[in-house]
Structure formats: structure tokens, C-alpha cells
Amino acid sequence: MKNYLFEVCTNSVESCIAAQEGGANRVELCAGIPEGGTTPSYGEIAMAREVLTTTRLHVIIRPRGGDFLYSPIEIKTMLKDIEMARRLGADGGGFGCLTANGEIDVPVMEQLMEASEGLSVTFHRAFDVCRDASKALEQIINLGCDRILTSGQQATAELGIPLLKELRERAKGRITLLAGCGVNEKNICRIAKETGIQEFHFSARESIKSGMAYKNEAVSMGGTVHISEYERNVTTVKRVKDTIGNLTSVI
């Protein structure tokens, strides 16, 4: 039997609870999901740690959306966020930094890795926009990261199957490949079979309606970027169970 591991990308404490109940081994807690995930708040991390009794807690360390080229003040912010996550009991973190030329920013990563000593580290999807995946793989291994979260440099992990397979073969067990982006109950079996990857990152979210009786839908909190204030996406126990079950049931 293969030792599959399932990480759920959670956007709230509510989603963390659902992930744990659904059987996730680990969560990656994020704020700012529409931006690709940003560092969650102190309170969110603290409450997630409180409710996650059987599921490991990882926290994304990303001070903003956009690219992965960080200023000195942003790097200092990331260092402080790593320390915050550690103090609150996180088991690990996810971060990634690039140079302006799309290379892994090794000196900055070394600072973050030193600050993360004793924590499990995922080099997140900054990898998917780097210039040279093969070179980056070796650099990330040398940095001592535990895993790389990647879609195979494509819009979804399913489209990235060829590179995911190649990366796993190149890694030769020196680092874990965590397949993520668009992984769901319908495609997880194909991704596992065709890549040989054993760790999967997915959100298992559904949209739920707001409980507000009064709604002023003429106003958007996002200004010109319209995201409805009257519905939100949360991880559901059923979708977590279905995604895990569809793979483990065919072992």
C-alpha cells in the first residue's frame, strides 16, 4: 500500500475543522485566497492550532499577493511571521523567494530557512514561475526544504503531469513533491497514477450563501475587484473525504 499524504489548503478555522474531520493529514492555513494565499492573522493561527488535534498545521508565509521578489522590509516581515507561527505551535511553513531574473533567491531563502529551523518547510508555488525547474529543484534540495508544492509549472496539476513526473524522477527521493492546484476528487487518481507522486494539496471547497437577511449588493468591499460579500468558499468534510477516498479506495 502506498503511503499517500493529503494536505488541505484552508482559508479559515472553519475549513481547518472540516479538513481534520475529513481525514486530512495536514493543512496549509492561508488568508487572501483570491491572491494565491497570504500569511494568516495571529488569531487565525492560534485558533487553528487549538482545534487541530490530529492534523498537522502548516502556515503560508507570504506578506502579499503578486510576484515573489521581496523587498528588505518584506523579508523582515516574513522572518517575524515565521517566528509568530513557531510561537503559536505551527508544525511548518510554506514560502518561496525569487530574484528578478526568475531564479531561486538563495541568500534570502537561507535566511528564512535558518529562522525555520525545527519546522517542516514547503517551498511553495513560487517554483511554478521560476525560470529553470531543474536547476531550481537542485537549489531547493540544497537549501534543505522538505517538499515543493507545484502544479508542474502549468495552470493545474493535471496539465502539469509531464513535468511533475519528471521532477519526481529527478528528485530520486531527496525531496517530496507535493502536487497542487486544481487537484480534486475527479482527477487525483490520474495525477497519482501518471506521476508517481504521493502527496497532494487541494482545497475541497464549496460556496455557501451568507446568512444576511439585508443585503446591499451595490457596494463591493474590493472596489473595482468584485467578490461577493454574500457568499464565501469553505472546505467541506464531504469533499475532503471524497477526494481522499477516491484515491485510497483504488489501492
Briefly describe each language-model feature range:
Residues 37-65, 104-126, 161-185, 227-250:
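Alpha-helix-loop-beta-strand connector modules within alpha/beta enzyme cores
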Residues 90-146:
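Hydrophobic, well-structured mid-protein blocks that either form specific transmembrane helices
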Residues 11-21, 69-81, 128-143, 167, ...:
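Catalytic cores of alpha/beta
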Residues 4-10, 27-29, 57-61, 93-95, ...:
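Hydrophobic faces of well-ordered beta-strands that scaffold small-molecule active sites
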Residues 13, 45-51, 55-106:
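Active-site beta->alpha loop and helix N-cap motifs at the rims of alpha/beta catalytic domains
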Residues 12-14, 31-33, 61-65, 97-99, ...:
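Active-site-proximal loop/turn and secondary-structure-junction residues that shape catalytic pockets
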Residues 26-38, 84, 88-100, 145-158, ...:
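Glycine-rich phosphate-binding active-site loops on the catalytic face of alpha/beta enzymes
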Residues 20-27, 52-54, 89-92, 115-119, ...:
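Glycine-enriched alpha-helix->loop->beta-strand junction motifs that scaffold or abut catalytic
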